Amino acid sequence: MARVKRGVTAHAKHKKVYKAAKGFRGRRKNTIRAAKAAVDKAGQYAFRDRKRKKRTFRALWIQRINAAVRPFGMTYSVFINGLSKSGIVVDRKVLSDLAITEPAAFQAIAEKAKAALAA
C-alpha cells in the first residue's frame, strides 16, 4: 500500500481554522493551537448567545411597553392584563414597535385595555 503524506489535508484544515479566526487579536489569529481554541470558544459563545438573544429582546420589548403605558396611568402588568381581558391578541414585539412608530395606534390599544379593566 502506498504511503500517504498528510501535508495537503493538514494545510487545508489549518487554513479553515485561520479563516474562522480572522480578526482575532494576537497569537489567536496565527498559531494553530491558539486559533483552534479561540474558534471553539467563539462557537460556544455564539451558540449560547443565540439562545440569550431571544430573552434579551423580549426584556427590551417589555421595557419599551412599560415606558409607553406609564403616561396612561398603567404599569406593564396591568396593561397586559387589560389586553387579555379585552381579547386583544398582539405580541410584545408588535406592541413595542407600535409604541415607537405609531403612538396614536398604541394609545387606542392602551385605552381599550384600560376600558376592559374598568368594566
UniProtKB/Swiss-Prot annotation:
The keyword Ribonucleoprotein applies. InterPro entries: Ribosomal_bL20, RIBOSOMAL_L20_CS, Ribosomal_protein_bL20_C. It comes from Rhodopseudomonas palustris (strain HaA2). The keyword Disulfide bond does not apply. The gene is rplT. It comes from the Bacteria. HAMAP family: Ribosomal_bL20 (MF_00382). This is Large ribosomal subunit protein bL20. One of its GO terms (molecular function) is rRNA binding. GO terms for cellular component: ribonucleoprotein complex; ribosome. GO terms for biological process: ribosomal large subunit assembly; translation. Keywords: Ribonucleoprotein, Ribosomal protein, RNA-binding, rRNA-binding. PANTHER family: 39S RIBOSOMAL PROTEIN L20 (PTHR10986). CDD domains: Ribosomal_L20. Belongs to the bacterial ribosomal protein bL20 family.
